[in-house]
Amino acid sequence: MASKCLKAGFSSGSLKSPGGASGGSTRVSAMYSSSSCKLPSLSPVARSFSACSVGLGRSSYRATSCLPALCLPAGGFATSYSGGGGWFGEGILTGNEKETMQSLNDRLAGYLEKVRQLEQENASLESRIREWCEQQVPYMCPDYQSYFRTIEELQKKTLCSKAENARLVVEIDNAKLAADDFRTKYETEVSLRQLVESDINGLRRILDDLTLCKSDLEAQVESLKEELLCLKKNHEEEVNSLRCQLGDRLNVEVDAAPPVDLNRVLEEMRCQYETLVENNRRDAEDWLDTQSEELNQQVVSSSEQLQSCQAEIIELRRTVNALEIELQAQHSMRDALESTLAETEARYSSQLAQMQCMITNVEAQLAEIRADLERQNQEYQVLLDVRARLECEINTYRGLLESEDSKLPCNPCAPDYSPSKSCLPCLPAASCGPSAARTNCSPRPICVPCPGGRF
């Protein structure tokens, strides 16, 4: 009757160093197979162990079981070892336990060497990361204070120059407005002079008219005088003719009334005419004086009104010019303030963009550093897990070696065979890793050899 032992499997994938220092990879798989033990008086016992898998970068390490319960009959132990992708099997027959132990020791030495190499690579990688971080610190925080001070000084000088330019522009505008004011005053005075000259010309025309009137009146007076002389001559002639006529009558008529005194009458007439002429002359002079005074009063009143209106116009023009000057100054100040505000906004926006860019770069660097730290932490945890698993395997192999050295394979055909005796003692408790549950061994089942010496 064929006898089969409990089955335990152990396999590991490719294990590659995270830092890339070692260019090769090792792939190991081992299998200890024995399916079950069938005894005449014992029920079959089967043990199973949890599987653990760990990923490291692009490499992987997978262990299906940490501590199998193994039966060692009088034959019945098989291993398989694969290196670099090739598979080969080695069957161990009865009496080849030393070779099996030697191969297991070689595998243990390889695992320990690999663990030591990975620890060295991890330490070198941590030192490289630390050196890189120390080298990157000055670059992450550059000192721009001197440049900022120079920029602030230049900005202050620029602002002072702009303020001085604005002040000079305002002064130039004020000078232009003052020149315009003086030009306006000059034009006003010229217009006043022209108005006075026109008034003088008008008065001269009036004076000429009055002179003409006076000459006309003088001509009339002369004509009246000539007429008076003519009348006097005519009167004398008439008087003489009348005298001649009356002389004869007087001679004839002695008792007649006394004759009229013609000289007296002529004197009276002369006095009357002279009085009339004098009155006319006086009236004409009075009328001329009255008209002249009225015209002078009108001219004076018009001149006063004109002067008051011109003064008011000048005052209004001065007020308008002052308001225009103030308006230009306010416009210039507003333009200067707007330009200063725009420059300040542009400067602060550029500084804000630079700071935002620096913050973004620092955040990106921090994110990269955190990602690297997390990756290194994961790799470190993976290495710790691998180390724990390797220690678990070492303990397993040590238990196997001790059990093989202390016990011999069971033979039921021997005279002193007893079914109650066990082939192997209980293995010590071992753990798969830091987080795996501990599995205690139970007494090993008794192996039954296969008929005909087969297992």
UniProtKB/Swiss-Prot annotation:
Residues 245-260 are annotated as: Linker 12. Pfam families: Filament. This is Keratin, type I cuticular Ha5. The gene is KRT35. Residues 97-408 form the IF rod domain. The record marks A346 as: Stutter. Residues 1-97 are annotated as: Head. GO terms for cellular component: cytoskeleton; cytosol; extracellular exosome; extracellular space; intermediate filament. Residues 98-132 are annotated as: Coil 1A. It comes from Homo sapiens (Human).
